[in-house]
């Protein structure tokens, strides 16, 4: 099973070395074309190209020379390069800026056309466009369906979405 799954989590590990080193961990025989495609899909290509040393840029211990969003997009590019059948995103956008989050979600939806994608998220706005949403409560599956069908059911998911939207609105007005 492990050989078919890649994971991008909140704290995906970035190795001490270069951007290229971090990518090659996923696929030691990756071609330049595959690397460029992974970087473009992860919305990281322009950033890497803007760096003086490009792919050979040293990222520092645990990616200390990169922002949170850049680290997550590097982890995403690495997952893409691994060419696994399934990619699991476990709260992958929870600790990053809005622009990076938007870029990562665009990449995730692009990937979902060719790969099986599993998104674990407490931010329900992140899963509205998913083909299928599974709602768990205390470890048990309580609902499944599209966003629209779950909202029409006016059950557990509906309540969670409304509570989350109310909370976000109240935070805006503070």
Residue ranges of each PLM-predicted region?
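Conserved catalytic motifs of ABC-family nucleotide-binding domains
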Residues: 11-30, 66, 126-127
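ABC-fold ATPase nucleotide-binding domain signature/coupling loops
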Residues: 45-74, 96-99, 166-171
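C-terminal portion of ABC ATPase nucleotide-binding domains
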Residues: 50, 54, 106, 128-171
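ABC ATPase nucleotide-binding domain "signature" region
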Residues: 67-68, 74-79, 103, 119
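Catalytic Walker B motif of ABC-type/P-loop ATPase nucleotide-binding domains
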Residues: 87-91
């Amino acid at each position: 099973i492990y050989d078919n799954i890649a994971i991008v989590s909140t704290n995906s590990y970035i190795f001490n070395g270069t951007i290229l080193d971090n990518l090659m961990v996923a696929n030691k025989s990756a071609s330049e074309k595959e690397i460029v495609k992974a970087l473009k899909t992860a919305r990281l290509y322009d950033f890497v190209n803007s760096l003086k040393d490009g792919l050979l840029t040293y990222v520092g211990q645990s990616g200390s020379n990169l922002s949170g969003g850049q680290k997550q997009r590097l982890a995403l590019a690495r997952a893409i390069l691994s060419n696994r059948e399934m990619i699991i995103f476990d709260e992958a956008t929870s600790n990053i800026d809005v622009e990076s989050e938007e870029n990562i979600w665009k990449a995730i939806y692009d990937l979902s056309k060719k790969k099986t994608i599993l998104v674990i998220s407490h931010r329900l706005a992140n899963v509205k466009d998913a083909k299928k949403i599974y709602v768990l409560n205390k470890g048990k599956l309580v609902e499944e369906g599209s966003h629209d069908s779950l909202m029409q059911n006016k059950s557990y998911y509906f309540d969670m979405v409304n509570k989350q939207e109310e909370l976000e609105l109240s935070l805006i007005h503070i």
